[in-house]
Amino acid sequence: MSEKQTFADKKRKTVEQAEFTEDGRYLRKVRSFVLRTGRLSDYQRDMMNNNWANLGLDYQNTPFNFEQIFGNNNPVVLEIGFGMGRSLVEMAKQNPDRNYIGIEVHTPGVGACIAYALEKGVKNLRVICHDATEILRDAIADGSLGGLQLYFPDPWQKAKHHKRRIVQPEFITRVLTKLGDNGFIHFATDWENYAEHMLEVLRQFDKELRNTSATNDFIPRPDFRPLTKFEERAHRLGHGVWDLYFVKQA
């Protein structure tokens, strides 16, 4: 590859918008992710460069027009942190009556997801390489989502890093404004402490959200959620896996 940077190479450097204080100082943010230095393969780079117009969406500070993007009014499900994207593509393939948007900040995963979507002939999927909190804040219209999926997010195990966990009350508040009536929130994690944290946060919204668990905590592993590599690793390590499924009350 030449030293000239392509679209895919530049994408990694623009996963969040720079923000400044009123006096012009750079505003440091508490991020729920760390940009790993995994190598973007030539194949993944080509997938992004050649197919972004059809399968990719760029950050914008106005809401996406989903009907224009997908050509229909089917419900839109947003997945945050899709990793390499195989489970997201499989879910989109299994549910042609839904549209899916996946957000991932790591370009190798974005390239791999695009490649797998092309292999499977999936048309009802778009990917975004940007900070999910900024996408939710700026590019998703209120009441426009049919559901939000967050599978195996970084657990930030150390107590001093718990503030970096994406599942916080302010995050749920934002998500609630973006969900339509009866929209769902589906979380999964293989860290028990994070599962308990998620449940504690979601329970703060018991007037807005209904827990579908018969025991008012976690649901059995649903068949509709494809197995991810993180879940496979969890099983190998003897970890449990916890699913939470809440529905916005009309």
Swiss-Prot record:
Its EC number is 2.1.1.33. CDD domains: AdoMet_MTases. One of its GO terms (molecular function) is tRNA (guanine(46)-N7)-methyltransferase activity. Pathway: tRNA modification; N(7)-methylguanine-tRNA biosynthesis. InterPro entries: SAM-dependent_MTases_sf, tRNA_(Gua-N-7)_MeTrfase_Trmb, tRNA_methyltr_TrmB_bact. It is an enzyme of class 2 (transferase). This is tRNA (guanine-N(7)-)-methyltransferase.
